[in-house]
């Protein structure tokens, strides 16, 4: 790990050599397509850095970025890193309360957004001195592009240490109030092996990367945008108001996307589209997925329908891309997240941090120091300390590791179901439910029971053409009971129109647990 490193310089400036190397393709909602070279990104991000400096932003100051996938988002990030400031990515689907919490908690001094999202910014944020507005009604704030036109083309990136703060990414809030995970510039370097292996030795000539995941989350930003730019691979940017699997395939085909990060929720929806390769002219080389466990059925479908094996990877906001698959190096075992990525010390440990032998269930942990590991929770030393047992960062995810090194995810600690003396992970049940021909999506949670402590309750979204009812519920119950242990079979099956999901596509099981009526 180098002592000095700056994300903005490494992901942009070193490729801006005057050759017109393609960096970014943007397809706007109206279908208009723009292309940006690394030379253009360098010039525009330099102007943005100069503009922010002119408004008094300096190294260490926090700058919010509230924009969807679009060129200005990439320009803003590169500028903030070059300036030595700290980027605070913000999801455009957040409401006023969520934005207020993140902007106030981070003490953001500046914000780059658009007119559509400006209206959600609450008044009275005492630290927020500057707002740049990309388009739409700027509400009297400086407009982004005219401001950049008045700024200079030259900017010398701050000589940051690899351990200097670079960005704050707020957790998705699946287990409580979102906390700001502070990452250093080195986090990009730490991600690289976890991008290269799941994408079968990324990059290769002709690679072009796209994800529907928003760049405000660690998956979109550090699994896709920044590593691709670091490797000199162009990225496709596109914002869909709502994920549509047919349009996703059409987008991939139109632009010749070779590499995709597709969250499990997206893959489950895309599985319903018939003959995608033939209909859309796909030429995918690699597909990676993470965020929720993938089922065996998705892996089988991807090989048959897409012609590629989906390589699952694993991480979290605090320490990402720790575990993954690489079909080119070792077999993808359905149900396993893969093996520890080289460069990371990963183990399954007890609650007190003792590594467990193969086959024993415990908590996935990463040992510090590690370049992908966060510096700590912003302004929350107590929560930071609670995240560790000695030098082991405890992810809170329960799994076992077999004697071949594969890690098998069982669920979050707080998602485990305790029934009749058995500790049951929801993942195996959900994987089995997804194999039933009538099931589109499924989630399993514990429900209080006076005899067993808890019973397994499954929430099921049936496929659109299926009539859900008691007969189907009994059929699904029997289907699971024949394939898993008897105590894993759901006692109750509840049909719902949709599952509650976080903005990153993770099932919010606590919300399902709180539903007292079937």
Give the location of each predicted region:
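Conserved ATP/PPi-binding loop(s) of AMP-dependent carboxylate-activating enzymes
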Residues: 340-343, 354-386, 424
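Gly/Ser/Thr-rich phosphate-binding loop
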Residues: 230, 257-261, 271-332, 345
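AMP-binding/adenylate-forming catalytic core of the ANL superfamily
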Residues: 94-97, 101, 111-114, 260, ...
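Structural core segment of the AMP-binding/adenylate-forming
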Residues: 54-55, 75-78, 82-147, 160, ...
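Conserved AMP-binding/adenylate-forming core of the ANL superfamily
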Residues: 24-78, 95-100, 146
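Conserved AMP-binding A3 loop
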Residues: 35-39, 166-193
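Conserved AMP-binding/adenylation subdomain of ANL enzymes
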Residues: 189-208, 216-258, 273
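Conserved pre-ATP/AMP-binding loop-to-beta segment of ANL
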Residues: 20-22, 149-170, 177, 202-208
């Amino acid at each position: 790990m180098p002592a000095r490193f700056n994300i903005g310089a490494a992901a942009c400036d070193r490729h801006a050599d005057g050759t017109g190397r393609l960096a970014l393709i943007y397809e706007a909602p109206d279908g208009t397509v723009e292309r940006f070279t690394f030379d253009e990104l360098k010039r525009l991000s330099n102007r943005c850095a100069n503009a922010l400096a002119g408004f008094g932003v300096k190294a260490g100051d926090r700058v919010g970025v509230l924009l969807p996938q679009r060129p200005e988002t990439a320009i803003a990030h590169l500028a903030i890193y070059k300036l030595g400031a700290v980027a605070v990515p913000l999801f455009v689907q957040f409401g006023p309360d969520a934005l207020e919490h993140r902007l106030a908690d981070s003490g953001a001094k500046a914000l780059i957004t658009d007119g559509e999202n400006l209206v959600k910014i609450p008044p009275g944020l005492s630290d927020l001195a500057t707002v740049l507005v990309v388009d739409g009604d700027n509400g009297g704030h400086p407009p982004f592009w005219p401001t950049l036109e008045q700024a200079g083309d030259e900017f010398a990136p701050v000589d940051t240490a690899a351990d200097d703060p670079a960005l704050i990414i707020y957790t998705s809030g699946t287990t409580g109030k979102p906390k700001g995970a502070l990452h250093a510039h080195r986090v990009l370097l730490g991600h690289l092996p976890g991008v290269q292996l799941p994408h079968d030795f990324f990059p290769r000539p002709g690679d072009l990367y796209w994800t529907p995941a928003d760049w405000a989350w660690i998956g979109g930003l550090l699994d896709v945008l920044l590593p691709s730019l670091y490797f000199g691979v162009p990225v496709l940017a596109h914002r869909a108001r709502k994920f549509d699997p047919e349009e996703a395939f059409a987008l991939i085909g139109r632009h010749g996307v070779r590499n995709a990060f597709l969250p499990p929720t997206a893959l489950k929806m895309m599985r319903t589209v018939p003959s995608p390769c033939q209909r859309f002219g796909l030429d995918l080389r690699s597909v990676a997925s993470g965020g929720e466990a993938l089922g065996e059925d998705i892996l089988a479908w991807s090989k048959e329908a897409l012609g590629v094996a989906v390589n699952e990877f694993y991480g979290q906001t605090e320490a990402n891309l720790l575990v993954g698959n690489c079909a080119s190096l070792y077999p993808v075992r359905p149900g396993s997240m893969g093996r520890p990525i080289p460069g990371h010390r990963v183990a399954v440990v007890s609650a007190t941090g003792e590594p467990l032998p193969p086959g024993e269930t415990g908590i996935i942990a990463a040992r510090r120091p590690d370049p992908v590991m966060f510096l700590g929770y912003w302004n929350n030393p107590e929560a930071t300390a609670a995240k560790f047992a000695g030098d082991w960062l405890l992810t809170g995810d329960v799994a076992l590791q077999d004697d071949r090194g594969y890690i098998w995810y069982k669920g979050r600690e707080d998602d485990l179901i305790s029934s009749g003396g058995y500790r049951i992970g929801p993942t195996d049940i959900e994987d089995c439910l997804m194999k039933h021909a009538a099931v589109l999506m499924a989630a399993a949670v514990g429900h209080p029971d006076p005899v067993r402590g808890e019973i397994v309750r499954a929430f099921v979204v049936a496929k659109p053409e299926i009539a859900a009812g008691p007969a189907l519920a009994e059929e699904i119950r029997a289907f699971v009971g024949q394939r898993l242990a008897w105590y894993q079979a759901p006692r109750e099956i509840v049909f719902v129109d949709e599952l509650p999901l976080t903005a990153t596509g993770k099932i919010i099981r606590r919300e399902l647990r709180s539903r007292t009526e079937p």
